Amino acid sequence: VMNLWPGVRLRVMEGWDEDGHHSEESLHYEGRAVDITTSDRDRNKYAMLARLAVEAGF
């Protein structure tokens, strides 16, 4: 993220969920999912952010 968008930070919104905010099959209940965004909340970056996550092994 910092190499692609200088000054923009990765934000982890949620990882583990035990309060039932996600669907029954959600991996959040196993700690195997994460909701992320960028500090500028620019939705145009989300597709590339997803690609970066896959390249990083997520």
Curated annotation (Swiss-Prot):
The indian hedgehog protein N-product binds calcium and zinc ions; this stabilizes the protein fold and is essential for protein-protein interactions mediated by this domain. Belongs to the hedgehog family. GO terms for biological process: cell fate specification; cell-cell signaling; proteolysis; regulation of gene expression; smoothened signaling pathway. It is found in: Cell membrane; Secreted, Extracellular space. GO terms for cellular component: extracellular space; plasma membrane. One of its GO terms (molecular function) is patched binding. The C-terminal domain displays an autoproteolysis activity and a cholesterol transferase activity. Both activities result in the cleavage of the full-length protein and covalent attachment of a cholesterol moiety to the C-terminal of the newly generated N-terminal fragment (N-product). The N-product is the active species in both local and long-range signaling, whereas the C-product has no signaling activity. Cholesterylation is required for N-product targeting to lipid rafts and multimerization. This is Indian hedgehog protein. It comes from Rasbora paviana. InterPro entries: Hedgehog, Hedgehog_sig/DD-Pept_Zn-bd_sf, Hedgehog_Signaling, Hedgehog_signalling_dom.
